[in-house]
């Protein structure tokens, strides 16, 4: 009997069956005004309301018969199965740049907790005030006391899209661009290696977190079983895209091409999925500002050749997408419509960041009324979720999910 695949993503729109999320937790309560920028936030969310909104989001998916898995639960279960808390903890502490006696304090303190509480503390951050009184021997310990954390919080973890992405039956476990997020993919690596749901399968890792160049899941879109679209953005390096293409062409039996699309390197356009998402077989939502008035932008077609990679530059974005999807025409639905003010406002609040749960059916933030009405006018079924606090982290429904299994399109 053939074992069911633990991972299977061959499109952006196939009926979503299993998804990985992270419920916002105490890591959000360790954000302070002084460290907003370094933790990649513009404001401090209200956690209680944020959790209510996230629970509503999860319920919306469950009501559509989607299996919703939680990162924090799977990580604790995987850590228990690994039966080696100290090894994972040592690696986490090292990547947090803790050295000398402070690393020993942190390790000994966290080793005293069970797996659930250890994972919670690794995610929420470890304040210096939490560890019992310790003798300071070194100059750096005495001078660095004003900084409140041994381990920084990971408040962006509820955006599970970025640390990893499923392509086909394999995965990219990503090297994140910002230091504030770099440890996030360690939890995905732990789960895939040790959780019984995944550990008994040979899951190809197309790109690992030890890669030299940054790659993030918000820039990875699986258009069909033969084509991956990757944004070259503020967070994803062109060299990472090329290395990913080489890996896919040499190890994946189905991927024939990788499309690299260049988008402006700004915070508001931090990933491709903040400006472009697939909502149906031949329909996408797009932020008009990423193209010129002729609808052009730089897109590169990477294909395997006898001499390695063949790269073909193009400018006609819409036509390229139509060609690879074998569609006569592609409908681009503008985020916020044609009004530049409305478009900019709704894109900032993730109006283009839709999560497709089936062909022609999406989840969006309720606040983006113009974009949602345009989607409905184009025949798309829209489920709106409450979003006043979730949106403060600069990510939408697609950002908050890592799809693990979708049905293949017929």
UniProtKB/Swiss-Prot annotation:
Please tell me where this protein is predominantly located. cytoplasm
- In this entry, which stretches build a coiled coil? none
GO terms classed as biological process:
arginine catabolic process to ornithine; arginine deiminase pathway
**Which reaction is this enzyme known to catalyze?**
L-arginine + H2O = L-citrulline + NH4(+)
GO MF term set: arginine deiminase activity
The UniProt keyword set, sorted, is:
Arginine metabolism, Cytoplasm, Hydrolase
What is this protein's name?
Arginine deiminase
Source organism: Listeria monocytogenes serotype 4b (strain CLIP80459)
